[in-house]
Each structure stands twice: as C-alpha cells, then as structure tokens.
C-alpha cells in the first residue's frame, strides 16, 4: 500500500538539512545516513549518500530515475549466494 497523496513524501528533517548544506557548499561531501525510509527528492539528484544496510554503509549516488523511491531500496540488506546446488547432479 502506498502513502496517501495528501500527506506528501516522507524525508527525515536532518537529511533535508544535510542535503541543503551539501548543495550550498562547493565540496561534495558524502552524507552518511541510517534513514532507509526517506524518500528521494529531486533536490537530492547528484548527491552522494552512504546508506546503512544493517551491517555496513553502501555508497549510493542519486540519479534522476531514483526520484520517488526510498533510499533503502538501493542498499540491499541480504546477500544472495544463489540457490543450493543438488549434490547428486554435481557428482555425475
């Protein structure tokens, strides 16, 4: 179920403040965040984030296509090793 339109997108307040500071400063500092639930806004395009996945920080550079998605979508929390192979089929 998606968020109702009248509420608008959710973004943590401190994240907006940090993004504003990064935009105004000349150097492109990386914004470290634990806020996976925050929606990516158009003013975040071009900024570099480090999103926590529960274990480490994953670097995410925001592009136009990411607007409207959540930051957590681009920092997977689970490692996929592939399906378990059948041992009988391997021996032959």
Swiss-Prot record:
Q: Name residues in a coiled coil.
A: none
Which NCBIfam families does UniProt cross-reference here? rpsS_bact
Q: Source organism's superkingdom? A: Bacteria
Q: Which SUPFAM superfamilies match?
A: Ribosomal protein S19 (SSF54570)
List all membrane-crossing ranges. Answer: none
Provide the protein name: Small ribosomal subunit protein uS19
Keywords of the record: Ribonucleoprotein, Ribosomal protein, RNA-binding, rRNA-binding
UniProt keyword GTP-binding, yes or no: no
Q: Name one GO molecular function term.
A: structural constituent of ribosome
Species of origin reads Hyphomonas neptunium (strain ATCC 15444)
Q: Name one GO biological process term.
A: ribosomal small subunit assembly
Tell me the name of the encoding gene.
rpsS
Cited InterPro entries: Ribosomal_uS19 (IPR002222), Ribosomal_uS19_bac-type (IPR005732), Ribosomal_uS19_CS (IPR020934), Ribosomal_uS19_SF (IPR023575)
Q: Which Gene3D superfamilies match?
A: 30s Ribosomal Protein S19, Chain A (3.30.860.10)
């Amino acid at each position: 179920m998606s968020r109702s339109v009248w509420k608008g997108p959710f973004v943590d307040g401190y994240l907006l403040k940090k993004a504003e500071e990064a935009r105004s400063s000349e150097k492109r500092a990386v914004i470290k965040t634990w806020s996976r639930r925050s929606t990516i806004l158009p003013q975040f395009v071009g900024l570099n984030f480090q999103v926590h996945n529960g274990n480490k920080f994953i670097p995410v550079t925001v592009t136009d296509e990411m607007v409207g998605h959540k930051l957590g979508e681009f920092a997977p929390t689970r490692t996929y090793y592939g399906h378990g192979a059948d041992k009988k089929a391997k021996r032959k």
